[in-house]
From Swiss-Prot:
This is Putative actin-depolymerizing factor 8. Actin-depolymerizing protein. Severs actin filaments (F-actin) and binds to actin monomers. GO terms for molecular function: actin filament binding. Coiled coil: none annotated. The keyword rRNA processing does not apply. It comes from Oryza sativa subsp. japonica (Rice). The keyword Magnesium does not apply. SMART domains: ADF. Keywords: Actin-binding. Belongs to the actin-binding proteins ADF family. It comes from the Eukaryota.
Amino acid sequence: MEILGFTVMGGGSPAWIEVPEKSKSAFWELMRRKVHRYVIFKIDDRREEIVVEKTGAPWESYDDFTASLPADAVYDLDFVSDDNCRKSKIFFISWSPSLSCIRAKTIYAVWRNQFRHELDGVHFEIQATDPDDMDLEVLRGRANRT
């Protein structure tokens, strides 16, 4: 049976969506090598795999990042902690505006959980439906609580 373009297996859950090495590599380059400030992912047109839609250079700002949304992405936040130490935390940001169509939200909800578990090394997850949910100060506040 097919639901929203996904093949449904016996348990009623959508089929596994492939996470190619190129997508995983983009995340590792962000996390380990600091090659990217952010990576934005999407489901390919065939709905078979998660691909990199865009990467941001290390010098790009949070405003550059948010201008590329809505999408699901990882963001490497550099900040100065409350005890005056330079730190970096990686956020998985799931941006699904409340006005998005239900079909799109459903498709992305299916892959989001699976994909998030592929990204070992993410410190925080933010599920945003409004720009205020992912304001830079929200990220800084979450990062400083650790």
